[in-house]
From Swiss-Prot:
Residues reported in the UniProt entry to bind Mg(2+) 2: 182, 186
Cofactor(s) of this protein: Mg(2+); Mn(2+)
Organism expressing this protein natively: Solanum lycopersicum
Residue ranges of the motif DDXXD motif: 182-186
UniProt xrefs under InterPro entries: Isoprenoid_synthase_dom_sf, Terpene_cyclase-like_1_C, Terpene_cyclase_plant_C1, Terpene_synth_N, Terpene_synth_N_sf, Terpene_synthase-like, Terpene_synthase_metal-bd, Terpenoid_cyclase/PrenylTrfase
Residues that hold Mg(2+) 1 according to the record: 182, 186
Domain of life: Eukaryota
Residues reported in the UniProt entry to bind Mg(2+) 3: 335
UniProt protein name: Sesquiterpene synthase 15
Protein's pathway: Secondary metabolite biosynthesis; terpenoid biosynthesis
Alphabetically ordered keywords of this record: Magnesium, Metal-binding
Length: 430
């Protein structure tokens, strides 16, 4: 029996979903969440999302307060597209409100588990923050975004389980360097300075600092020192080969950032598919982060797995496309005011003569199609184990969450600050 046959049980002879479903809020919600795992050519799941979304919105005014909050949250953040720790915290609260329909013992275990992990995560954040302060790049590079707490939260979205403590430590630090690199190439460096830095990173040798400006020397030496330290640690477990793959991805990222800088300084609007999106796979930073996310993982992260991800497999391309386009949508207006490099919005408008609204609609369709590709890559057998695919999927979920309505990373003092506090600091109410 096909998995689609399960959904056909809820349709009539014409293939429409049965109207009786509209009175079952929990059933609609379950159908809505299940349909989020759709892939291409599954029209019955496309219709399920349309059907459930429409009727859940109609039901909202009639629902109890707790159920209304749960439905509203699901419509904005379906489980397949959100951060696990945030969803866990939210659903504990939702189910506490529905004591009559929930197993209280199960809720108590969930609360205990969340609290234990929260304490562990707070200790990890203290260690990361200490490292960040000792590095002192935030003070020396005042133009860069100082977001170490937000980046640790980002990392928690990739993996929160106890066994990934070392992996989280490494990935958060990589995120810090990626964020600074982005700011250097996007907002601060001149084209001449960026040319010198790009060449130095290609060489990946401390001798390459001779032509760099003072602030770039600080960044560059800090970057190389960090990767050297990671290599020394991994060498103890015969896993130092992993670092070469991570460095290679960092070089690809810098090339992509440099290409954007050249477009900007040349007042060039690139072609949407063959130029912008091709470069955007790397400029999304997801290939760099996905590769780095495996550095501190177990023996399943083999050399063959690193070779596989370095070829930009479809699941990584889909993840990167989603992250790139979501970022473009929420930062578009601000970047126009700043006179920044053309994003996918301008590229699409320029190439197809579309309005801004038409470009937004089309790009959201592209995002949904890439989610279908991503789902297919996660659900079908692959050349690497699922445990290695989860960080790729979870990086996409973080992007969906952080770039939902705004660039919550750049403007983290808005809504993101409260979410981080809820996950990392606030105790669960009894």
């Amino acid at each position: 029996m096909s998995h689609l046959d399960v959904f056909r049980k809820f349709t009539d002879d014409q293939g429409n979903y049965n109207k009786e479903l509209v009175n079952d809020t929990h059933g609609l919600l379950s159908l809505y969440e299940a349909a989020q795992f759709r892939v291409h050519d599954e029209e019955i799941l496309d219709e399920a999302i349309n059907f459930t979304t429409t009727h859940l919105k109609l039901l909202l005014p009639k629902l109890s307060n707790s159920l209304s909050m749960q439905v509203s949250y699901a419509l904005k953040y379906p489980i397949n597209k959100t951060i696990a720790r945030v969803a866990t915290r939210k659903y504990i609260s939702f189910y506490q409100e529905e004591e009559s329909s929930c197993d209280q013992v199960l809720i108590n275990f969930a609360k205990l588990d969340f609290s234990i992990l929260q304490k562990m995560h707070k200790r990890e954040l203290c260690d990361i923050t200490r490292w960040w302060k000792e590095l002192d790049l935030a003070n020396e590079l005042a133009f860069a975004r100082d977001r170490v707490v937000e980046l640790y939260f980002w990392c928690l979205g990739v993996y929160f389980e106890p066994q990934y403590k070392v992996a989280r430590n490494i990935l958060t630090k990589v995120l810090c360097f990626v964020s600074i690199t982005d700011d250097i190439y996007d907002t601060y460096g001149t084209l001449h300075e960026l040319t010198l830095l790009t060449n130095a990173i290609e060489r990946w040798n401390l001798d390459a600092t001779e032509n760099l400006t003072s602030y770039m020397k600080l960044f560059y030496t800090g970057l190389l020192h960090f990767y050297n330290e990671v290599e020394k640690e991994l060498e103890k477990e015969n896993k130092s080969f992993r670092v070469n793959f991570a460095i290679s991805e960092m070089k690809k990222l810098v090339r992509a950032y440099f290409q954007e800088a050249k477009w900007y300084h040349g007042n060039t609007v690139p072609k949407m598919e063959e130029e912008y999106m091709k470069n955007g796979i790397q400029s999304s930073a997801n290939p760099t982060l996905a590769t780095a996310s495996w550095l501190g993982m177990g023996d399943e992260a083999t050399k063959e797995a690193f070779e596989w991800i370095s070829t930009e497999p479809p699941i990584l391309v889909a993840s990167s496309n989603i992250a790139r386009l979501l970022n473009d949508i929420v930062s578009h207006e601000r970047e126009i005011e700043r006179g920044d490099v053309a994003s996918s919005i301008e590229c699409y408008m320029n190439e197809y003569g579309a309005t801004k609204e038409e470009a937004y609609m089309e790009i959201r369709k592209i995002i949904e199609n890439n989610w279908k590709d991503l789902n297919r890559g996660c659900l079908k057998p692959t050349t690497v184990p699922r445990v290695l695919l989860m960080p790729v999927l979870n990086l996409t979920r973080v992007a969906e969450f952080v770039y939902k309505d705004e660039d919550a990373y750049t403007f983290s003092k808005n809504n993101l600050k409260e979410v981080i506090s809820m996950v990392l600091d606030d105790p669960i109410e009894e």
